[in-house]
């Protein structure tokens, strides 16, 4: 079967005609029907693309996103089987995005221009006349352009990006188009600050990547190959751009997820990204860590960035100075980590992002910044700050030193982001230093000594919070007396624990005494149960089992730790912070030893269990054979017993079935009899439960007795009920009569009071409204003359303006009318000339057709005559050969043949016909007339 005929030009022409008459929706629908027709499968995609482009342009103008999405998917489904089908899909997708972005830019520019025009006239437009006009003009908007128009186009643009991404996703032949659309979508979100759309875009890209990973194990055409370096690099570039846009939009959670995506893709990739790309990645990573308060990782990231930036050929000394200073400043801003810690670190995943095996320390970061290639570029002011904080730290002079250095630091743009972290570090160092020199100090004096100058200062309330945080993290041990506003520093970490232990022991003793009192009361109330009392006395004579709580366990461990540390000389003379550090290190060492012991015990237990398991398996193999024989014998016996039991059960079930059938038949007959009785119109009814176990005869007797009993009972109840009803009704009416009269009097009085109140309220309200209206009337009478004069002046001004405008518009209308008349007249003249030309051409074509028909008819007649002549001449020649004719006869025949050839040549020339562009032939070469042809024919016959 031949493929259907496609005429794309006709579809575009039809759409243009509909658009020209204002039927854009119909034009769009006609193009949609053409694109989604099945005959598109047989066409070359290049011939259909102009129709798709026209459809996209028209659909974007009309904002028919759903229709466009459906048409694109249908188009992809129809053409993807052809050779260049997917390439055409990519071109169509790019064209769609171009149309949408162009339209979006145009709408946004138009809205901005409208906003600028209205902003220019905001001050000059507020006049008394405009205020009066605003009373009767409904549209009083002064907010600039209509934001809803731009918002609707933003939504349409976003949905268009989503539709295209869904169209080209996870296809190896559309990877470049997919990457380009992803980049343009991210730029759209960044340009118009679309945070929610960017989050959904990032989630969509992750789903696409997950689907691509899932397809790696499948077999199919056009599957994305993630093992290809170019494909993986494209995905990696998308994630780098995603991270960059996340940071610019300040979507920190989304930025962190993008960092994880980049990390996993870099692990999959065999090639290292470019240094500039990695430098940008680490710069964004540092911003994310700064926002998440991961100061150590922030410093480590800046160090990696600096190493990559050193290979930049365009780097300047100022850049090295800036970035090296940031590394040292961020290291100084890292919180103190003097005390060792154990346990799970929630930031372990973040360490792996930077290739770190464990958590780095603050000192390591500072030493990292002190490396020669970094330290030589650091700003002198930052070096002075480092010397003040780490080398020459003195709590008494640090305030003045910082105050002298702070103005220079504030002049540096990168210092502002580390102010809070530096403040916390300095305050904690001050608190630790004061805890070593002071025992008890007033709170105001403490805060004055620990406070910092300038932007590093804090109010007392926030300083107290930092002090409590330092105590929580065990850098100081304090006791705050709010009555005397005094802070007491403890020098020994076990001192406050021992005090707390004494308090806890007293509370436990009180609880035990209360428990004994309660037990005594229960014993007094339980004298009636002698046996239980004796058992209770026997239990009391026994020693109570010790109850170990979590608090007791911790207290005992701390007491043991205290005894161990008291034997160390360095512990006695150390400061509080050094004691805490030594205690933690000792406790960690002991815990590690105990954990190692437990691991060793568990390994020994596992070895013994493994050996026992091997022994058991060896003996189990022998027992398995014996058990198999026993089981086989038991199975045969059970099978025989089961068959015998099945036969007995089958016989029993057959007997029971017969009995059930007989009982069912009997019950159906009884139920039928009962139903017929219950259908009759009488009061007595019989339930199925009443006739359980009775036969038909007994049921009939029961029915007769029920009917007799029901009849007598009904008569008695009717008589009694009538008497009761008569007496009760009379009694009710007598008793309620005085109550009804009393209620009527009270209701009458209540209604009269309500009426009087309502009447007075109506009169008062009417009087108040009248007075208010009279006041308004008196006020308006005073300004009425001014209002009339202003109205007349405005009316006169507006009428004069409108007269000028009307005159101008009338002149313009007349000029346009004359121009239109001339244009229509000229157009009609041209149409008439064109019609006349067409008629003349039609007549000429008709005349030429008639001449050609006549020529063909004459040519046919000449061919027939020539054929007859040739047959006759051939016969005559044969006869002359047989008879041996003379020379004169042969010469005559030659002349006839020559003339015949001339006739045939003339017929051929006539059949070819004269060309329209050729000139008229001369008389010498003209065709023979009909009379000349007849003479030649007669001569040939002779």
UniProtKB/Swiss-Prot annotation:
The keyword Zinc does not apply. Pfam families: eIF3a_PCI_TPR-like, PCI. GO terms for cellular component: cytoplasmic stress granule; eukaryotic 43S preinitiation complex; eukaryotic 48S preinitiation complex; eukaryotic translation initiation factor 3 complex, eIF3e; eukaryotic translation initiation factor 3 complex, eIF3m; incipient cellular bud site; multi-eIF complex. Residues 499-529, 588-669, 705-734, 821-912 form a coiled coil. Residues 836-870, 889-911 have a biased composition (Basic and acidic residues). Keywords: Coiled coil, Cytoplasm, Initiation factor, Protein biosynthesis, RNA-binding. It comes from the Eukaryota. It is found in: Cytoplasm. Its main location: cytoplasm. RNA-binding component of the eukaryotic translation initiation factor 3 (eIF-3) complex, which is involved in protein synthesis of a specialized repertoire of mRNAs and, together with other initiation factors, stimulates binding of mRNA and methionyl-tRNAi to the 40S ribosome. The eIF-3 complex specifically targets and initiates translation of a subset of mRNAs involved in cell proliferation. It comes from Vanderwaltozyma polyspora (strain ATCC 22028 / DSM 70294 / BCRC 21397 / CBS 2163 / NBRC 10782 / NRRL Y-8283 / UCD 57-17) (Kluyveromyces polysporus). The keyword Iron does not apply. The gene is TIF32. Belongs to the eIF-3 subunit A family. This is Eukaryotic translation initiation factor 3 subunit A. Residues 320-494 form the PCI domain. Component of the eukaryotic translation initiation factor 3 (eIF-3) complex. Transmembrane segments: none annotated. Residues 502-546, 836-942 are annotated as: Disordered. Residues 504-538 have a biased composition (Acidic residues). One of its GO terms (molecular function) is mRNA binding. One of its GO terms (biological process) is translation reinitiation.
